[in-house]
Amino acid sequence: MQVPKNNIYTVSRLNGEVRQILEGQLGKVWLNGEISNFSAPSSGHWYLTLKDHYSQIRCAMFKGRNQSVSFKPVNGQQVLVKGAISVYEPRGDYQLLIESMLPAGDGLLAQQFEALKMKLAAQGLFAADTKRQLPKNIQRIGVITSPTGAAIRDVLHVLARRDPSIEVIIYPTQVQGESADLNICQAINIANQRLEVDVLLLTRGGGSLEDLWCFNSEALAHTIYNSALPVVSAVGHEVDTTISDYVADVRAPTPSAGAELLSQDSDNKSQRLATVLSRLKQSANHYQLKQERRLSLLEHRLQRLDPKRTLQQFEQRFDEMQLRLEAALSNKLHGLSRRQQQLANRLEKQSPKHKLALETNRLNYLATRLQDAMQDTLNQSEQRIKYAAHQLETVSPLATLSRGYSITTDANNQIIDNAAQLSVGDKINTRLRHGQVQSTVTQITDES
């Protein structure tokens, strides 16, 4: 082999020319890769390796450049960098001198998420005093989701189990992909135009940050904020958080949790019915005690007044009270019957017939007991009135006359109970059971 005399490179010369060629030919490039071997010595410079599945390249980012990076790089993080290819001549290593660095993939989305979150918070869209209270008695729920996704199946399953009387109206929409956020906005606007539901449930199942990205839309945030209907956001899993969660009136961690939040257990409804019946019974007992006190007062007044007139007034008042009691009982029973029929109609759609039959029998049983108790009270009151009237008739002067006695008075209408009160020739008047007799005293006999 013949060695050339004039074209022999030194190592330094070769590395220098390679550097000039690389820097001159490639210029600035954008590179996407995963960080490894990251180090940040006291000098403030950053040194790292960017790699993919098949290759890797050494990188350096000097202090003057890395101070503008808004995050701290870590090993395993995907980044997007811009830089120039160069050669580190002392080792003959070629490397990328990074000028700027951005998160790639989820990292970039996370950065955009935080920026939008800060912007909307500054505009007041997350303020607690703007949140609306959910209705207490929800009858109809509007679900904004994909009609074929797992979320709607979970929601319907929970509602059927907890409260089958709740009606569900689905507003179908995309929940992933390009323009999905605008599709969701349209569904919310349609629901607000129709105003056919009590509350909106915005929901979908779990997914990656990219899958859920349509729920981080600024347009969707303003649509939720301006909704006249209360909005519950139940997007993804418990660890997922979206902009819609912050803007919504209430956030639920999962679709199933959202359905549970908006429904009441059927057992709770039965308890409420039992509470209504208990209050009705207490009201009836209170009314009964009140009427008994009135009866007692009337009996006391009856003893001081004319018996017949007082008795007539009392009988009239008794009739009025009886009519009022019967009307009140009828109204209460009618109201309970109407409420029972409403519940029966709503529950009939889901066929909870057995439970409804039990509740109906229980209601009829309580109503019968209440009616019997009120009738017993009326009968007792009537007996007390009759007894009081009999007592008054017993001590009445007219009753004494009916037994054959008479009452004798002088000319001044003073009752004569002693012969010493009279003189021969005095005029006297004798009152019998039927009629009066006027007499003149002709003889006085002292039987003492």
Swiss-Prot record:
It comes from the Bacteria. GO terms for biological process: DNA catabolic process. Its EC number is 3.1.11.6. Keywords: Cytoplasm, Exonuclease, Hydrolase, Nuclease. CDD domains: ExoVII_LU_OBF. InterPro entries: Exonuc_VII_L, Exonuc_VII_lsu_C, OB-fold_nuc-bd_dom. GO terms for molecular function: exodeoxyribonuclease VII activity; nucleic acid binding. The keyword Cytoplasm applies. GO terms for cellular component: cytoplasm; exodeoxyribonuclease VII complex. It holds the Pfam family Exonuc_VII_L. The keyword DNA repair does not apply. It is found in: Cytoplasm. It catalyses: Exonucleolytic cleavage in either 5'- to 3'- or 3'- to 5'-direction to yield nucleoside 5'-phosphates. It is an enzyme of class 3 (hydrolase). Heterooligomer composed of large and small subunits. Belongs to the XseA family. Bidirectionally degrades single-stranded DNA into large acid-insoluble oligonucleotides, which are then degraded further into small acid-soluble oligonucleotides. This is Exodeoxyribonuclease 7 large subunit. It comes from Shewanella sp. (strain MR-7).
